[in-house]
């Protein structure tokens, strides 16, 4: 809930610079938590022994959280690919996921593509469809909603497989 509610809370109000800085840090750290939190039920449901993947992904999450807490001013071109790399670790596991649940694997893949498209939009700051009302940031969040729905669907399907 927090990973979805915080961006709305953060973006829908005007805050003091101090509060904005805190919310921005929290928002960026939540991305790593969302990625690792998505991997966790999928790994448990689809892998015979999920320990290696869970250690890798939660270590990545801890590292990314520390990185964003310590260097919030890092350039967009540096930190955005780190989230993409963390998300793409799943590619190595797709052949193992497929025989257990092809539907979950497809939903996971489509969601990953949506998230990557959103990350590219965020990194490039374009396209801005209607700059005053629906800019690149709204396109980015639209992609993340699509990715979230696909990944939630993958988790539901995998947990019932």
Task: Annotate each predicted stretch with a short phrase.
Residues 3-161:
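Multi-pass alpha-helical transmembrane bundles in non-GPCR membrane proteins
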């Amino acid at each position: 809930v927090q990973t979805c509610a915080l961006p709305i809370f953060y973006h829908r109000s005007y805050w003091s610079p101090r509060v904005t800085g805190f919310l921005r840090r929290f928002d960026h750290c939540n991305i790593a938590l969302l990625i690792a939190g998505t991997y966790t039920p999928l790994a448990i449901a689809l892998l015979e022994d999920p320990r290696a993947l869970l250690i890798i992904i939660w270590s990545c999450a801890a590292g990314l959280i520390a990185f964003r807490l310590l260097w919030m001013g890092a350039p967009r071109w540096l930190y955005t690919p780190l989230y993409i790399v963390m998300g793409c670790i799943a590619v190595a596991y797709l052949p193992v996921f497929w025989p257990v649940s092809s539907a979950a694997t497809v939903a996971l893949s489509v969601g990953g593509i949506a998230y990557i498209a959103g990350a590219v939009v965020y990194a490039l700051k374009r396209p801005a469809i209607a700059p005053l009302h629906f800019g690149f940031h709204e396109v980015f969040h639209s992609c993340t909603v699509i990715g979230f729905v696909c990944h939630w669907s993958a988790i539901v399907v995998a947990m019932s497989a």
